[in-house]
């Protein structure tokens, strides 16, 4: 009989190879990436365009444009679009991030031919109707006003502004007046400039059932437009570490954001740094969780992670604590940073974190959608094809001395920006 009081032995992770995508360059220069998997009769279609915040000529125009894409086309109202998507049990949404805009369709495979014309119409013929535009602007401003009542939201805003600078798109704060001043003409012009299908990266995965050619015909027509101007904005060189405490009268909570510029994913030590970050604050048994949550009882949770954008990467440590406990929490974070610099990580702890990192990675590849997410990251971040194979190899091979060296180079408390809001 199985003895459930004894944990099963940990097995080493075998070599990981992502499924190879079929890549086709379409007549208009767009690229179609296909990852077939017929385990379930479902499909996901994603169209990625260079229409993120980094490309906008006016603040928050990328956000406004993406959120208006489903609000009406030349042939359909927003209600008609929503009804058609719901009728087929599908989902369709469009979002804008720091670097790109992403339109995503999930549907049953048999409905893909029916829904493709709708997706094409949404991408190429949005009309940005005035009534829906006004309502969206009002809703968005109200939502931001609600979010800004939270110290955690304001701390993140201020941290990004201090890290990247107020003039850099990654560091710009949401400006309510500027957002309300955006017009339908602004959205139409940005759509014309930043949403050409010739610049699209199209990702099709799931039970594609021979529909690749139909997708290629849908998104491959039209002229090969000029590349979207996305002026390279290197990481600000005037970053200044230090402390920035913003008092919030009447607030019982304080939100902490601590971090610094961080090596990009293309850096040769990126996977070792990922392991170091995991040990610091990347899982429930991390150093920060054990100290600040379990031992000191200052918070329900604390994290450390690297945030990758196409033109800059940052390390961020974040938590919410009682206002009176903020100085102690900052001091304990700095204490844990110095411990990693001054002490070798015990072999047992290092082995636990390696197993956690590799196990979580394997679990994150359990569906074709998740596999496609990893592949898409390689494409958009221009990473080597064996990036995730390197992750497994370097994670397994990294020793405590290497992590201590990296901590001494990158985790000095004096090199951090400390933001306390509350």
Where do the PLM segments sit?
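Charge-rich, well-structured scaffold segments of protease-associated domains
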Residues: 1-6, 80-229, 294-422
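His/Glu-rich zincin catalytic helix
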Residues: 1-83, 188-291, 330, 334, ...
